[in-house]
Amino acid sequence: MEANQCPLVVEPSYPDLVINVGEVTLGEENRKKLQKIQRDQEKERVMRAACALLNSGGGVIRMAKKVEHPVEMGLDLEQSLRELIQSSDLQAFFETKQQGRCFYIFVKSWSSGPFPEDRSVKPRLCSLSSSLYRRSETSVRSMDSREAFCFLKTKRKPKILEEGPFHKIHKGVYQELPNSDPADPNSDPADLIFQKDYLEYGEILPFPESQLVEFKQFSTKHFQEYVKRTIPEYVPAFANTGGGYLFIGVDDKSREVLGCAKENVDPDSLRRKIEQAIYKLPCVHFCQPQRPITFTLKIVNVLKRGELYGYACMIRVNPFCCAVFSEAPNSWIVEDKYVCSLTTEKWVGMMTDTDPDLLQLSEDFECQLSLSSGPPLSRPVYSKKGLEHKKELQQLLFSVPPGYLRYTPESLWRDLISEHRGLEELINKQMQPFFRGILIFSRSWAVDLNLQEKPGVICDALLIAQNSTPILYTILREQDAEGQDYCTRTAFTLKQKLVNMGGYTGKVCVRAKVLCLSPESSAEALEAAVSPMDYPASYSLAGTQHMEALLQSLVIVLLGFRSLLSDQLGCEVLNLLTAQQYEIFSRSLRKNRELFVHGLPGSGKTIMAMKIMEKIRNVFHCEAHRILYVCENQPLRNFISDRNICRAETRKTFLRENFEHIQHIVIDEAQNFRTEDGDWYGKAKSITRRAKGGPGILWIFLDYFQTSHLDCSGLPPLSDQYPREELTRIVRNADPIAKYLQKEMQVIRSNPSFNIPTGCLEVFPEAEWSQGVQGTLRIKKYLTVEQIMTCVADTCRRFFDRGYSPKDVAVLVSTAKEVEHYKYELLKAMRKKRVVQLSDACDMLGDHIVLDSVRRFSGLERSIVFGIHPRTADPAILPNVLICLASRAKQHLYIFPWGGH
């Protein structure tokens, strides 16, 4: 964002974005009486606020008027709002209300998709001006947002140069206007004039103005203003439209050369000013190399009867590869409660933002929210094929009953009314006006929205009811001056996330209401409405379709998380938790301070561990350095550490060092822990139980099917692993890989190794396998090492040609020692195929193929996995190691068995 912020500020005491633009003269006749400068200043404030709200999820413009009686807005304001949305349907995005001396404009969020008038595609952003110009025959035309959007989309699709097997780089198409030959009768007459070293005063140029030619005459009295106004429009217009010639000092009607008298202009100063004006023009590239705008500037003598009379200026502008602006676009957004202008680069990035174009997304995932139909700040959301769609998740979690008001989750509601006398009566009284919908309870809606929990809050409840706006209730144990601020902040965050994360495109607000459950009497309740504004009727949910659409956006808000693909794609993409994962994630941490989570291979245990640590920070108001994540191997430790949500260590480091400041511990891949360095479980319990305010969190994630050794794990007996939850929905692997996992899991269940507790594998019959994801499973036997390496290199080459990158590939061997053994042969084969370098799993974000051991890659994943000679010292755990190997592959798995077995 630009540092120079607009002096408009968001008012903090509302559960919505409310921008106060100060006093504005309203009424058509009143506005006509204003001086033009005041009328324009008032209009600019209102338009900036409207633009910022359209681009930031919607909200309210609040302005003061001089009279209390109702008055119309004014035609100039109405017309400017219509121009802003480029539609005559003003009510689609703006509605007005008046209360006393306050005039409110309710602004719905902008969203992509077709214009209703002509079905053309809306731009991603609203802008007061694009600052993009183009030639239109003899005129310079400013592009509106719709034209700018189409122009930028076209510029973003140049020829593509492939450099290497996986880097696709846009190659700019650079052109220059051709130089003409005076002897050629077909030569361009404008270029012939441009090549001259002088012009004659009064000379009539032999060509008219056209798309390629513009004539301008200037007065030296206003030279600075002329350069400031003319150059930033005409030079970008030529650059954006095939190039052209700007002749300054030629009358545009008569084509007569007039120049400027030598007494009134310094040619060197003129050159400097024009060059400075051109070099200041913002240029945005979609290509490499990023070359500057190219032009030729000539200051030539104008002769009168053979004597120097003055000077003329000629500028030849070459076509530009991408986009040249006159200045930064006039577009606004709300950031950190300030109204800020967008930089040119940010504006172009948001205008041209599209869903990721990745082969893997189309093969593995289904789109739940697309940028092509979402609000400006939304991100694309994908779910794994075979998993619940957002509509199915909404029906599972937040279904709207046919003719009554439902309280959910029922188990939480029962707990709350058993813990707090009078709560049921208080809630039922509040719900009397509503006959259909859903009331969603939470111990803390703030925590659900990634905000900090507030002490003294019994619960929050979100009402989604027919013929009502959404209402967030906060129920306090006793009166609290900060209770209303908490409720307002939570409602504000919920409303913003429903639009900007959940992609809701309807008119929406969330009213905030605070209730106090008096300890003296269960029937007494003190309440305070936080939002004094009366929203238009269109903000109420009219029926089932509207309620379900809003609840589907709520599903994305609550179940969405940053996809691990985001780092690979270079843009933020969201995935959704499964209903089973969300059920565990939504459990009260205060009531489940210790929990064992048994998850089958590919059920999302590590994702859950990361989500739980984020929740711990908000529930217990603790810093990241007070949460410890412990795993067995260093690559997974590094991967989690890079997220900056906790302190991450390996088991060995955990047992070796003291952790005086740690309050909460999350342990992952615990089935592969050992006791060789000490009692890790005992140490973890002692650390989390030493706090004076009560025990901290100790959650342990494990999967006995992936036990890769025969030593003692240090886990307590299965009967003591309580409370315990199970993740049985397999979400990672393609169908052929999932079937292979099923087969190997059945082998383990039939004949488990001696260190796997009896009964812990009985979760297998409950396994749910997501289907519908195509993939590959190849088991290639009886190959020499050289043949294996050639096969790996050839297969990688084919995948890279299809759009995959080295970040998608892992080559896994049995032990760390074998890595060096195979590395030389693999590199030799890769170099023959002109592929890439290798690295171990400690650098998962690097642009390279991972070569490491199966054990060190535990907890990580790649789309394409090669398993070379998987074997173990004891055959009893070979099926476990094969599961560890296979479950790392999301889509394509190639196994080269040792000795053909």
From Swiss-Prot:
Record-listed Zn(2+) binding positions: 285, 287, 321-322
Transmembrane regions listed in the UniProt entry: none
Cofactor: Mg(2+)
Keyword Cell inner membrane: no
Result, substituting residue 668 to A: Abolishes ATPase activity without affecting its role in DNA damage response
EC number(s) reported in the record: 3.1.-.-
Effect of residue 252 to A: Slight increase in endonuclease activity
Description of what induces expression: Down-regulated in small cell lung cancer (SCLC) cells resistant to PARP inhibitor drugs. Up-regulated by type I interferons, poly-IC and poly-dAdT.
Effect the entry attributes to changing residue 234 to A: No effect on endonuclease activity
Expression by tissue: Exhibits a wider expression range in ovarian and colon adenocarcinoma than in their corresponding healthy tissues.
UniProt: ATP binding residues: 599-606
GO terms, molecular function: ATP binding; ATP hydrolysis activity; DNA binding; endonuclease activity; helicase activity; tRNA binding
Compartment(s) of residence: Nucleus; Chromosome
GO BP terms: chromatin remodeling; defense response to virus; DNA damage response; immune system process; negative regulation of DNA replication; negative regulation of G1/S transition of mitotic cell cycle; replication fork arrest
Miscellaneous: Dominant determinant of sensitivity to DNA-damaging anticancer drugs: acts by mediating cell death in response to DNA damage induced by anticancer drugs. Down-regulated in a number of chemoresistant tumors.
Description of its domains: The N-terminus contains an endonuclease domain. The C-terminus displays homology to superfamily I DNA/RNA helicases, although it is in an autoinhibited conformation.
Function, in words: Inhibitor of DNA replication that promotes cell death in response to DNA damage. Acts as a guardian of the genome by killing cells with defective replication. Persistently blocks stressed replication forks by opening chromatin across replication initiation sites at stressed replication forks, possibly leading to unwind DNA ahead of the MCM helicase and block fork progression, ultimately leading to cell death. Upon DNA damage, inhibits translation of ATR or ATM based on distinct codon usage without disrupting early DNA damage response signaling.
Annotated protein name in UniProt: Schlafen family member 11
Annotated source species: Homo sapiens
Upper classification of the organism: Eukaryota, Metazoa, Chordata, Craniata, Vertebrata
